[in-house]
């Protein structure tokens, strides 16, 4: 994105985003969180504070590889993790000999790009529960989410996955959100276009 740039975070902003993560994901006390995000990128989407606030366990990897991820899930009882769609694809396309049958669902938050509906469908069949968010470095990571509507539960799998690839409902802790025309700086219609 051009020359290196920096963003200064405030403690208050990081705190608000951490609370937003908890609320958005409806996270319970004592989660077991697997780190596949770099903590230096948007402060790990503020999950160092999110997990710690819930008295959770942080599970760290030396390398983000499918085998290591699946072993950590089994060995530590991972309940939550985050990862870009490329991590989802890595898990879906892992050799069968490293893919365990998950004993319980693993909640996975994804961002960085819109995940392909086929990847969402495939990874959910493996036992992952996907939530899609969008954010920017300037807003501490996640800022908007695909807020799931219960009526989507009965849709065909492909259509459900297509809906899950969307996002756009602001985090509760965000002051506001608007999408503007860059030339006029006026709000664009909220019509999904």
Model-derived features with residue positions:
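Active-site glycine/GP-rich loop and adjacent strand/helix microenvironment
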Residues: 168, 188-191
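Gly/Ser/Thr-rich phosphate-binding loop
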Residues: 53, 75-83, 92-162, 172-178, ...
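Alpha-helix capping/helix-boundary segments
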Residues: 65, 86-88, 115
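Short beta-strand->loop structural element characteristic of the AMP-binding/adenylate-forming
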Residues: 6-8, 35, 57-63, 131
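Conserved pre-ATP/AMP-binding loop-to-beta segment of ANL
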Residues: 1-3, 26-32, 173
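Conserved AMP-binding A3 loop
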Residues: 1-16
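Conserved AMP-binding/adenylation subdomain of ANL enzymes
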Residues: 15-32, 40-79, 94
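AMP-binding/adenylate-forming core of the ANL superfamily
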Residues: 176, 191-193
